[in-house]
């Protein structure tokens, strides 16, 4: 047994180490000169408290820090945060060599996906074969499949109109977006739109992982432990996280099948996987035909890519649709304007025009942009690291390697940019919208998809889904909100994407009938 005096000595040394670390971080660190709470400067336990104990509250605590300390604050021992909408382009658009913050890239237990890649050159390599697949032209070629899914959603809503059941909007939109992105990734659909109550979707699994991500950020070893844990135990203890492991295994199996198909037809550039039931090229068929090195085409990496792509392609689109529908159903004046425009543009409600035609409808497009603005996209901060040069903000010189972050929510709800920023006002996007105080284009501050080389690659697909779905909903059906109010869409928690109050039952409505001609 270890001598008690040795234990005491070790305890004293540990305490002295902690004291020395605190003194260094407060007074001698390169970040010591930057304003912010002393507790935050001392330890990451400050962030742990707000995000893990209080459940997704650090984003809002950072906002309170800015109210007290100004536009630049030190939010933990190693990182700075800036709240100044005019600096967004400087941090995310103008400097292509800026990297992601490695510590935050591993918060889901892997950093091999394109979006989580730290180094800018490797990110560019991984993104290059994806860019053509998400171009406007490629998404237009894929659009018939989106029309097909919109039509299936319409049929399901007609069933709800007939039987009078209450519709939970986010579940329906998760199923819709899940079927769309799985069709584009693999060439087949999971058929979530056909499930009872739209309950067979990815939402529960991704939500569980997102809510766990704050803990995983502070203790990344937990993902290793989960990965090594018996699946039967996970199913019993954390059933929704277990669902993610099931999905992960399923995706890797599908990727493996696609790889085998391509290895069997190495010379056929037009070959597609046996999983692909559609005529269009799929994302993973194209990735395997790309010039990426073999190390980038492994089952494990492409499986992680698929997992991330589905999450990004489902959660944000579904929430944007849910938010937009809620505000339209809550504001009869806006809804009446939209219906009038849709009736004039779509004489036959059973025959939707192309998304290109719909995007030319000014009020529909304004509703889409305003709904996306209020839904925010991602709510978590987005750190960047300048590997070689200092970042200059105002009179502050930030040393290289120091992570600097901003938050889309701060820009999209900035009262200096958006009048009445918390209100749904589609009219703000009509004509040539300007910032009232400066005359700048309002579009400059529309950042839910990010900007620059790391902006959301799925922006074109999201716009097609939004325009087609909203046009179908409000040209064909009438709705009535059911036991739902603004608290069911107000952002109260940051779990990577916005989360309303934890007690919410979702945005619910009854499909009351068809639009009267």
Curated annotation (Swiss-Prot):
It is a multi-pass membrane protein. Glycans are attached at residue 111. The chain crosses the membrane at residues 4-24, 219-239. GO terms for molecular function: heme binding; iron ion binding; monooxygenase activity; oxidoreductase activity, acting on paired donors, with incorporation or reduction of molecular oxygen. Its cofactor is heme. Its main location: membrane. Heme binds at residue 456. Its EC number is 1.-.-.-. InterPro entries: Cyt_P450 (IPR001128), Cyt_P450_CS (IPR017972), Cyt_P450_E_grp-I (IPR002401), Cyt_P450_sf (IPR036396), Cytochrome_P450_monoxygenase (IPR050121). GO terms for biological process: antibiotic biosynthetic process. It is found in: Membrane. Keywords: Antibiotic biosynthesis, Glycoprotein, Heme, Iron, Membrane, Metal-binding, Monooxygenase, Oxidoreductase, Transmembrane, Transmembrane helix. Pfam families: p450. One of its GO terms (cellular component) is membrane. Pathway: Antibiotic biosynthesis. It comes from the Eukaryota. Belongs to the cytochrome P450 family. Cytochrome P450 monooxygenase; part of the gene cluster that mediates the biosynthesis of sordarin and hypoxysordarin, glycoside antibiotics with a unique tetracyclic diterpene aglycone structure. First, the geranylgeranyl diphosphate synthase sdnC constructs GGDP from farnesyl diphosphate and isopentenyl diphosphate. The diterpene cyclase sdnA then catalyzes the cyclization of GGDP to afford cycloaraneosene. This is Cytochrome P450 monooxygenase sdnE. It comes from Sordaria araneosa (Pleurage araneosa).
